[in-house]
Amino acid sequence: MQIFVKTLTGKTITLEVESSDTIDNVKSKIQDKEGIPPDQQRLIFAGKQLEDGRTLSDYNIQKESTLHLVLRLRGGIIEPSLKALASKYNCDKSVCRKCYARLPPRATNCRKRKCGHTNQLRPKKKLK
């Protein structure tokens, strides 16, 4: 039977499959056509993410059904230099004791009118 796979770019891929094919098998066919590794593919049908070990018939996918292909988000760690820069940017601030406005580290008075431009500032607490 024939099914369609629609990518986020709007491109539609046509695949020739059997209802007994597994989702793994379908992902392999997508890799053959598009070059996207199966571990980066997520297939969605009727609002559900399809699990690798299950078959097309498990999800009631019939001829000329359309699956949606979404790529997996890649995570990772932040470089130590970027982490230091981010913590410096976020932590080297002063905070108004009355209105909790974040201010530059060298500020002497609050910039907000609601606390009357008070001079009661404290350093922002450091993240642990």
From Swiss-Prot:
Instruction: Keywords in alphabetical order, please.
Output: Cytoplasm, Isopeptide bond, Nucleus, Ribonucleoprotein, Ribosomal protein, Ubl conjugation
For whether the record's keyword set contains Ribosomal protein, the answer is: yes
**Any one GO BP annotation for this protein:** protein ubiquitination
- Superkingdom of the source species: Eukaryota
InterPro entries, per database record: Ribosomal_eL40_dom, Ribosomal_eL40_sf, Ubiquitin-like_dom, Ubiquitin-like_domsf, Ubiquitin_CS, Ubiquitin_dom, Ubiquitin_ubiquitin-like
The effect annotated for residue 29 to R is: Deficiency in ubiquitin-protein conjugate formation
Q: Where is this cross-link: Glycyl lysine isopeptide (Lys-Gly) (interchain with G-Cter in ubiquitin)?
A: 93
| Annotated Gene Ontology cellular component terms | cytoplasm; cytosol; cytosolic large ribosomal subunit; nucleus
User: Which Gene Ontology terms cover its molecular function?
Assistant: protein tag activity; structural constituent of ribosome; ubiquitin protein ligase binding
Q: Which Gene3D superfamilies match?
A: 4.10.1060.50, Phosphatidylinositol 3-kinase Catalytic Subunit, Chain A, domain 1
> Can you tell me where the transmembrane regions are?
none
For whether the record's keyword set contains Endoplasmic reticulum, the answer is no
Q: Where is this cross-link: Glycyl lysine isopeptide (Gly-Lys) (interchain with K-? in acceptor proteins)?
A: 76
Q: Which SMART domains match?
A: Ribosomal_L40e, UBQ
Q: Which family does it belong to?
A: In the N-terminal section; belongs to the ubiquitin family. In the C-terminal section; belongs to the eukaryotic ribosomal protein eL40 family.
Q: Give the misc comment.
A: Ubiquitin is encoded by several different genes. UBI1 and UBI2 genes code for a single copy of ubiquitin fused to the ribosomal proteins eL40A and eL40B, respectively. UBI3 is a polyprotein with one copy of ubiquitin fused to ribosomal protein eS31. UBI4 is a polyprotein containing 5 exact head to tail repeats of ubiquitin.
Identification of the protein by name? Ubiquitin-ribosomal protein eL40A fusion protein
